[in-house]
Amino acid sequence: RNALSLSVETLAMSVLATAMAGVAVLLTFLPAARNLGNGELGGAPSRLWTVLYYLVRATFTLTRAIPELVWALIIIFFLSPGILPGALALGLHNYGVLGKLSAEVVENLDPRPTRALRAAGSSNFQMLFYGIIPQALPQFLTYMLYRWEVVIRTTVVVGFVSAGGLGREFRLSLSFFHYSEVALIIFWYLILVVGVDLLSAWLRRLARFD
């Protein structure tokens, strides 16, 4: 029962981390695309957009350059141990990874639909929401689900520094040589990984279908 409860905590940590990273990226990945600021997609070149490009790109680089374990050590220094520090650490690192991937999706978009909208008299706002986001959103969702698969595997790593879930219990059981408990934790961990992989694959198929 304890292992099942810890598995639920681990799953909750991974979902929370992926959701936080996904929402943050969804709000910031457009300024990180170079072709939006320089007018390649049909909009007018903007100096403000160029400044935002370098600022957001630097944020992506910083957050993904620091490993999840280091983020967890820093956050636990300020917060009490639990799944929230682990989710924040995983979310920060994956924010940088997912943000870079999503920005590159926009940079590789076909510019013809947005240029056609601009030629038809669309505003910048209409061009973004009718020409860019509909093209980028399916690939963004696919990348976010891929990162969820990575996050569920990394929860054990941040758990080693008391960030909650199966990782913390795994470290304690290993320290006291309770190998039967270690085997049980690994069993539940494998169930989580396989379950998340299958669910993520199904959701990715839905995203591609849409």
Positions of predicted regions on the chain:
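Short amphipathic alpha-helical coupling elements at transmembrane boundaries
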Residues: 5, 9, 53-64, 104-119, ...
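Glycine-rich helix-loop "coupling/hinge" segments at transmembrane-helix boundaries
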Residues: 77, 151-189, 208-210
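C-terminal transmembrane helix and the adjacent membrane-cytosol boundary/short C-terminal tail
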Residues: 142, 183-210
